[in-house]
Amino acid sequence: MDIVGGQHLRQMWDDLAGIYEDKTALIFESCAGEVQHFSYASLNREINRTANLFYSLGIRKGDNVALHLDNCPEFIFCWFGLAKIGAIVVPINARLLREESAWILQNSRTSLLVTSAPFYPMYRQIQQEGRTPLSHICLIGPTLPAEEGVSHFYTLKAQQPDVLLYTPPLTPDDTAEILFTSGTTSRPKGVVITHYNLRFAGYYSSWQCALREDDVYLTVMPAFHIDCQCTAAMAAFSVGATFVLIEKYSARAFWGQVRKYCATVTECIPMMIRTLMTQTPAADDRHHCLREVMFYLNLSVQEKEAFTERFGVRLFTSYGMTETIVGIIGDRPGDKRRWPSIGRPGFCYEAEIRNEQNRALPPGEIGEICIKGIPGKTLFKSYFERPDATAKALEPNGWLHTGDSGYRDEEGFFYFVDRRCNMVKRGGENVSCVELENIIAGHPKIQDVVVIGIKDDIRDEAIKAFVVLNEGETLTEEDFFTFCEENMAKFKVPSYLEIREDLPRNCSGKIIKKNLK
């Protein structure tokens, strides 16, 4: 099924500007509460000016340009401005430090970076060290340092016309983006994403939550992340809806923002749901317009039920990863839901559970979740300059090995068990970290938890739990281990406990387990 045809992102924005004109496309709210509005026509003009800015800096079709930005309108301008001239955006996780950021610049062969004032000193140091291809920094900020190799984003953009100066031929198969995976367990890999991928994501994700042009899709997810781009932004823009981008997530501000913008759809990760539940209950908890809350793994049954009961919302399960572009398994519009299932495959995809010999397993048996799609269209195209990693993950016939363990039932509902790399091998038994985390999260004194395996000379691996307590609470090791012994099999009970003030997370909310080992 080809639902994109010959369309690319330049054509998309020209069409949207003509169809929706003065309708609000983008609303941005900063941490300071400042709000900016852009219509479809005005946003397209900003995108064109930004495309011309890059052209003036020597960027041409096929060139890579990095972005290291917090959520801001300029991210949207750059993302689509680069696509319009056939250049390739390389978003960098806004929480990465110098060595990690330099590694991405080096491995993506990127010479031009757009960043903002808080990150400038780090990149100036990288630039001066000369260990990466970085030769020019385009700075978004109130002032411009008088330094060579640095230009001011808004000064350059103000000099540009709002009609494109450079329009090279584009096809849907052209690369639009290299999005590096979060690298929570190892070095990140660059996921190559095409114009077709992004156009398809818009159609698919808008179908997934039955999005219409009168909807308002609000997100606090980071703009450099696949969820913000393909589940939220592309979905909203593809149907002419309004996309509300919040600079940073605040549990105290979230519901006020939902009400302020009359949001009808949003997306949440477990960390958000847990912190929202820690807020003092209010009489207006259910006073909102939300129709759907897109939800990503993992929540316990108790957490899910408590959240839906308190706020009067439906959690709409969506399972995917950077390589799948969208949530390829999930709850479908108008279809029944079966918690704790992650749902059923969406259109254009097939899914199977396979064993270690790569053979399909029958219902009820746990194996690897594998997805069939079309590389460069409904799945990522490849890993950037990593043919070895591409061949390991993606079969020639389009089957993607997710690395996740799961099973399916007789009706085709799929169930997520854990990341294969997130299983602890303990004395011959495979133990799911997610299973233990969901149980431990049920302790009334615990706010957050992560479980990892650590080396054990006798039993291969021992289990260690890191927990964050609710404010003002104390917890003894005896109480913790007693709770575990009462709620899980003996071989699953952690051997070690560490109480921390917080857990290391990346901008998408995933815990960085390698920082705990």
UniProtKB/Swiss-Prot annotation:
Identify which top EC class this enzyme belongs to.
Answer: ligase
Pathway(s): Amine and polyamine metabolism; carnitine metabolism
InterPro entries assigned: AMP-bd_C (IPR025110), AMP-bd_C_sf (IPR045851), AMP-binding_CS (IPR020845), AMP-dep_synth/lig_dom (IPR000873), ANL_N_sf (IPR042099), CaiC (IPR023456)
Q: Does the keyword Ligase apply?
A: yes
Gene Ontology molecular function, alphabetical = carnitine-CoA ligase activity; crotonobetaine-CoA ligase activity; medium-chain fatty acid-CoA ligase activity
Any idea which UniProt keywords this protein has?
Answer: Ligase
Q: What is its EC number?
A: 6.2.1.48
Catalytic reaction equation(s)? 4-(trimethylamino)butanoate + ATP + CoA = 4-(trimethylamino)butanoyl-CoA + AMP + diphosphate; crotonobetaine + ATP + CoA = crotonobetainyl-CoA + AMP + diphosphate; (R)-carnitine + ATP + CoA = (R)-carnitinyl-CoA + AMP + diphosphate
Which family, according to UniProt?
Belongs to the ATP-dependent AMP-binding enzyme family.
Name of this protein: Crotonobetaine/carnitine--CoA ligase
